[in-house]
């Protein structure tokens, strides 16, 4: 699902809100989440999951064109951990399909 599909689905169910208002709300939520992660904060949405930063240690990589070894610096990457309710819902949905 893309951001625009999310906005469309919300607009279908919330006819008292304009699509522009929904779009603004979704963009603001994502912006605030990005800001929080960029300052090292953890985000927890109960029943959905949590977002945090994980550190990737420096490592040696390879340039795919030349095969030359390249030292890659350590970096922080966003990490999502689904909550129990989310895990259960996904597992039930997938098991009922299969």
Swiss-Prot record:
The Basic and acidic residues compositionally biased stretches are 82-91
**Gene Ontology annotations of biological process type:** DNA recombination; regulation of DNA-templated transcription; regulation of translation
Record key words, sorted = DNA recombination, DNA-binding, Transcription, Transcription regulation, Translation regulation
GO CC terms of this entry: chromosome; cytosol
Keyword Phosphoprotein recorded: no
Role: This protein is one of the two subunits of integration host factor, a specific DNA-binding protein that functions in genetic recombination as well as in transcriptional and translational control.
Listed under subunit, the entry gives:
Heterodimer of an alpha and a beta chain.
Q: Which family does it belong to?
A: Belongs to the bacterial histone-like protein family.
Q: What is this protein called?
A: Integration host factor subunit beta
From which source organism is this entry?
Saccharophagus degradans (strain 2-40 / ATCC 43961 / DSM 17024)
What taxonomic lineage is listed for the species of origin?
Bacteria, Pseudomonadati, Pseudomonadota, Gammaproteobacteria, Cellvibrionales
């Amino acid at each position: 699902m893309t951001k625009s599909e999310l906005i469309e689905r919300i607009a279908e169910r919330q006819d008292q809100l304009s699509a522009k208002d929904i779009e603004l709300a979704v963009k603001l939520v994502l912006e605030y989440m990005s800001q929080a992660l960029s300052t090292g904060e953890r985000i927890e949405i109960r029943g959905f999951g949590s977002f945090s930063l994980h550190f990737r240690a420096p490592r040696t990589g390879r340039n795919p064109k030349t095969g030359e070894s390249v030292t890659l610096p350590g970096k922080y990457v966003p990490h999502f951990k689904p909550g129990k309710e989310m895990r259960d819902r996904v597992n039930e949905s997938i098991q009922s399909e299969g």
